[in-house]
Amino acid sequence: MVVLPEGHPLAGQGQFPHKALLDYPFILLEKGEQSEIRTFFQDYDLPLRPCFVTLDDYAIMSMVESGLGISILPQLILQRCPYRIVQKELDVPAYREICFAFRSLDSLSLAARRFLDCLGSLRL
């Protein structure tokens, strides 16, 4: 999902045009060597020129809320977003794979079952 500050010129439109990511300061979420966002930019032949790079989702939400730029964040982290930001779907597919391995449903803890329920309720 693209996250924008409230009042952003594209906040009231439908899907966010992926090429418009180049028109605004971009805040990059960088976790580990394999970045899904870097891959997304490469897949759509977009040059990635972040104005800020951070490891923390909440830092990005705070920076976006403050008007420092826009970003792409996983839908899962945005479900309980405490910040005043706008969430928009992109006009092209952007996703990541989440794998969850277990021996049997009977062996799962309550927390693991709830996590599995949460994964099942996401729009895929």
Predicted regions and their residues:
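Short beta-strand-to-loop elements that line the ligand-binding cleft
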Residues: L28, P47-D56
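A local structural motif
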Residues: Q42-C51, I85
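Conserved glycosyltransferase catalytic-site signature
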Residues: Q34, D56-D57
